[in-house]
Amino acid sequence: RSPALTDFIFMVKEKSHMFITGPDVVKTVTNEEVGKEELGGAYTHSSKSGVTHFMCDNEEETLMSIRELLSFLPSNNMEDAPLVPCNDDIHRQVEALQTVIPEDPNMPYDIKDIIEPVLDNQYFFEVMPHFAKNVVVGFGRLGGRSVGIVANQPAWLAGVLDIDASDKAARFIRFCDCFNIPLITFEDVPGFLPGTIQEHNGIIRHGAKIVYAYAEATVPKVTLITRKAYGGAYIVMSSKPTGADVNLAYPQAEIAVMGAAGAVNILYRKSTPEEKQEIIKDYEDKFSNPYCAAERGLIDEVIMPRDTRYKLIQALEMCHNKNQSNPPKKHGNMPL
């Protein structure tokens, strides 16, 4: 039986190994010399292949991590997400969120500085923390109810989507949908990673997995756009057109086909630098803001960062009795 058929895989550093063929067979067939740790150890599978979800230092830590993971999950796929008593004020404001996002839209920040403070007791249980770091996934609680978190990470590759990030996010989204766990998406995405490596390895096919997973999911889906939401990557990250139930945005959110500078350089390539700067400012005022999108029904509410926790809980309450079903099929045709 393949371990990849299980929902989550835990490995212990320097003790756990898995591979299709061991080092001896690899050397015999390909003449490549490689140790079992490099070939299929915990670090390899948690950071390079993405096969394992958790890498632990010892067996005791592994067992504790398994217990922690199970606390977020229902007993089976017919039950709702677990609801536990919440001693954290649902109206709690987080003033620090007002200054987390830099004024310069090209400056990075850690999306976990937004995720963690808004969750119950500021606790976030991250899944696959060492693989495809440009996307963050994991579990938390809001108002006592388990939620699945999917977020772009501006601190790693500017938060772009690539092949590995697409696979990581899509698999997690589908797991949450299987076990009735609501999805919270924190979006700050400038686009898909460009280049021949991505194109030749099928970024179109892999990128389609995220949009398929979101569109297929019937659990409550709440999205918060923290800063950038550009082009096709915006559509992919649980947007209104793909079936998101509630879409929120911060005042500095930029929802557009592309950034102002990129758009102006294409549309006004013959203009002088001075003229371009003036046009960029006009473009940003007209299009690179959440209010234009809100007028078109793509954003439900523009919120202040300090109110994020309550607004997310409020949105989940609105969707709690959501009843949506897909057309009767044995299964969908996921783009694999």
Identify the residue ranges that each predicted region occupies.
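Ligand-binding clefts of soluble mixed alpha/beta catalytic domains
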Residues: 1-336
